Amino acid sequence: MKFYGYRRADGSVGCRNLVAVIPSVVCAADVAQAIVQNVQGAVGLFHHQGCSQLPPDLKRVTDTLIGLALNPNVGAVLIVSLGCEGTDYARMFQEIQAAGKPVEIIGIQKLGGVSKAIAAGIDAAAGLVRKISGQQREEADLSEVVLSIKCGASDATSGMASNCALGYAADKLVSLGGTVIFGETTEFIGAEHILMRRAVNQEVADRIGFIVNWMETRAKSLGCDMRKGQPTPGNIEGGLSSIEEKSLGAILKSGTSPIQGVMEYPERVRTSEEIKKGLWIKDTPGREPEILTGMACSGAQIMM
């Protein structure tokens, strides 16, 4: 089966052809937003990170922003740097450039302030839009699709209808050679043993058990019980009685394919060393902004 998309220099195929304007730190977000508002065809990938964080957190933010920039739906990138942030904006530029994707960078402090940076950014973003606007869609195989799947407003019918349909779609794409990612580690509780039985080997099974136990351990270290937050009031109103019942419905969206492995939050499907195929778990929170960002960072062109 085929679809039509935008072939990238790294071999991936996008369903969209957007210029992403990415602030390297929250302090540059207003400038990035002003640029996006003045350039048709540009989208802003705003966030509240990048400063006054510990080194492991800053590395994760940098890795995530690089992953978002390398998503196949992004045709070109403008990085908006402040100049004194903790994130590694130079590495962002280098890795995006090394992947063959058109990229520009502006520095607010280096340019002499906000107004000059906005003007320079508008020029740069508009130039990138012009640069990629002539690219045409071409035929690609469905095996090049990376699909991410997530629950939405779970209720008593999720495990009987919507998640079953998602599971069928996931199995179909895997059978065609594509990649499917699912996450929401908080919604594996009580059903992790079922996922572990679907692992391709014992190492993957152990990893699935570990991420669930580690998530619960972190909550307990703060004096919290995950079962006090799950299921949510909306889930209960919809007919769910426990986190175990919610999890049993949630995991149905992954279908029945063998689970190939567990990906860390900023980990990407496509790297210079490999292209992950089949069904994968991504260790993520259940909250939409975090999980959807993580899925886009992995390279998902489509989210359901």
Q: What are these model-derived regions, one by one?
A:
Residues 1-150, 154-304:
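Metallocofactor- and cofactor-centric catalytic cores in central/energy metabolism, strongly enriched
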